[in-house]
Every structure is written in structure tokens, then in C-alpha cells.
């Protein structure tokens, strides 16, 4: 079937893989830091948070900016609210950036020079990790000893910088994978590029080195243990949150449609996110084509917004999707829109009949929770963390696989029952209330405490 993921045997393990595992485990062991005077705190006072490849100041939905950007910003601000200061280190992407930017009280963004400002693909960033680490160390050198109590790294590139920084500073390392190479490679979209072996090895090293690992869901925790041999006791599950002040039903669907210039009575299936094969926006377009083949009378009352910017390869460019829409004969109902700010994104969610997420993999799927918080149900692939984010049959529908016909059947149900979207939307808003960022920050602070305690025990054990 076109677009079906390739699924290699996950249980087969070659001799080469065993050697890689042993090698990574060996390298991943950190030498205990020299004994330092420890403050017996329940939680850290200041955290160095690392996000090498994407800045929390960038617009989500374009380039490599997405859910992780939102995650870092919201988490950092909520940690600051409970008296944990956060300094976020990220790569500078333009010479015009100030070295430091105060994002909000207690949250500072530090821009690190590492490689050319523009035109550097994410795939080329491993060669710049030495330069990035140098910049982090320079910032640290300007402070008194013990300035940072803990390092929290995001994504494997940051994990390698965090590994070295934590060892040099004598602090614990907490790491969040966000995505994993082995999991992505097991469910590739057609036209997508497999993650390289270097990333697999790098992730295994980080898993071995970290004092604690944060997983978005229990399934992700299981994947860390199964694919990367993580110690079960080191893995903590912390669900991401949603900004319930921003993403809420507010003044409702009719008002949002009026603001966006959308017809009041239309069926509006929305795609919102980066345009890349992994997110599978082409599945939505093909599903719409199937729907209109079966129900041509719906054409005059159908609008399909695609809100997001390019990333990746293959169908990553909007022009590729535009050409696909033309080939499918649905260009007249599809509206391409560039990435928008969070406030306007909330309006797009409110205006939609249903958010469609046919992704091949999602570690959690923040936009699913954001849409539900705004009062809109979700139609999604049953992958990754989406079964946690979406209550199947109550706040949306989960589809096994990526057959456009299966998505078309659900869209037809929304077309035939106009009250279905509103009914599910009310349940979705209630469901999303369980995912506040305050809860996520409190749980993360508990992980920090556990990491600091484990680190102290390890140091004491090493030095008698």
C-alpha cells in the first residue's frame, strides 16, 4: 500500500548490534565527579537546559521548530514559577541575536555560536557539538562553582553536550529523548530518510550516562528499555502539558471561523504542523480525495486548511503538497497557510471540525492536546503517544495504519453528523484539563530531586 511504513523485525538482533550496544554502554559510563560540597536541597535552584538544534524563540511549525520548542518554553516558565531558575542554551542562527534574552522572569535564553548562522542542516550539527560545548563551558566559566545544580538536555544532540557538561560540573544529568532513532526507523514514511547509525550509537551512550531519563508516555519508557537497554528505575514518565489559558474553547467555533474568514457550516478537517513525511499530511489530502470521490456533493461545503511550514525531505515542501492536491483534483478545497503564532493557532483549532494527525510516529503529539483543549476532536494514527493524548471514541478517533480510505470514513461520519464534532469537542476540552503544564513542571521537579539524590549516592559510593 502506498505510504505504508516499512516494519523490520524489531526482535532480531545481529552480532553487529550486540557489539554496538556493548560499545555504547562502555562509553556511556560516566566517571564520578570529584567530591564537592553538596547542598541538601529538595530541588535544584538553577538548571542548565540544553536545546542545540532548535531555539525556544523560533516559530513552531516551520523548519525544525515544533512541539519540542513549545515543551521547553512552557516547562521552563512553569519551573521558574516554582522557584527553579532555568537557563536555556541554544545555537545562534543569526548574528543579530543578542547573546542572552530573558524569556520571562527566571528563564534566560543563551545563544551559542556554533557553525554558520544560516544554511546548516540538522544533519550537519553533530560536527558542531564541540563548538557548542565550548560555548556552554565559556558561559559556565563566568560563574562561581556550583552555579548550575543540574543539566537537563533535550534530543540526542543536546544529550552529548549535557553528558560532558554534567561530568565537568559534577552535576546530575536528566535527559529527554523526544524522538528515538530506532523507533523512527521502524516506522518510516515513504520518501523519508532513515536515521544514521551514528545517532543510534549516540542515543545509547546518553541513555547509559544519564542519571534520569524522562519519557512522555509509558510506551516511550518501554521503548527506552527495549531498544536502548535503559535501566527501568532511571526512567520517569512525565506527560507534557498544554497551556490551558491559551488553548480553550473561548468564544467558540463560530467566532473563530468569522475571524479566519471560514464558512460557518463547512466541514473543516485541519492539518497543523511541520510539513514533512513523518507527519503525513499527504494522507489527509488523499483521504479528502477519497471522500469527494464517494460524496462529490460535499465539495461545495468543504475546506481543508494546511497550516505549517517545510521541513525534512520528499513531500516536505509546500509545493510538493500543492502539486499532489492538483493531481488529486482537490486543489480548490485545500488552503495552505504559513506557520502562525500560538494565539492564532488556537483560533485555527477552535474553527476546525476535526484536527487530523496521520503521523507515522509521535512521541506524544502536543498539538493533539492543544486542539482538544480548544474544544476540537482529533482524528489520528494510533502511534506513539497519541493513544494517551486522544481518548479513542470519546475525544476523537484513532486509526490503525495510514490507509487514506480509513481516514475518509471518519471524515464522512463528521460530515453526516454535524453535531458529532461539537459533542466530542466538549469531551475533548474536559480531557485536556488533565494535562496542565503546572502538573508537568511539578513532576519534572520530582525527577530532578531523584536525579540529585542518585548522583550524591554515586559520588559517596565512589569516594567512600
From Swiss-Prot:
GO terms for molecular function: acetylglucosaminyltransferase activity; D-inositol-3-phosphate glycosyltransferase activity; magnesium ion binding. Catalyzes the transfer of a N-acetyl-glucosamine moiety to 1D-myo-inositol 3-phosphate to produce 1D-myo-inositol 2-acetamido-2-deoxy-glucopyranoside 3-phosphate in the mycothiol biosynthesis pathway. UDP-N-acetyl-alpha-D-glucosamine binds at residues 59-60, 67, 274, 279, 340, 362, 370. This is D-inositol 3-phosphate glycosyltransferase. One of its GO terms (biological process) is mycothiol biosynthetic process. It is an enzyme of class 2 (transferase). Disulfide bonds: none annotated. Mg(2+) binds at residues 349-350, 352, 376. SUPFAM superfamilies: UDP-Glycosyltransferase/glycogen phosphorylase. Residues 1-44 are annotated as: Disordered. Residues 1-20 have a biased composition (Basic and acidic residues). Its EC number is 2.4.1.250. The keyword GTP-binding does not apply. Keywords: Glycosyltransferase, Magnesium, Metal-binding, Transferase. Belongs to the glycosyltransferase group 1 family. MshA subfamily. Coiled coil: none annotated. The keyword Amino-acid biosynthesis does not apply. 1D-myo-inositol 3-phosphate binds at residues 53, 64-69, 122, 155, 179, 199. Homodimer. It catalyses: 1D-myo-inositol 3-phosphate + UDP-N-acetyl-alpha-D-glucosamine = 1D-myo-inositol 2-acetamido-2-deoxy-alpha-D-glucopyranoside 3-phosphate + UDP + H(+).
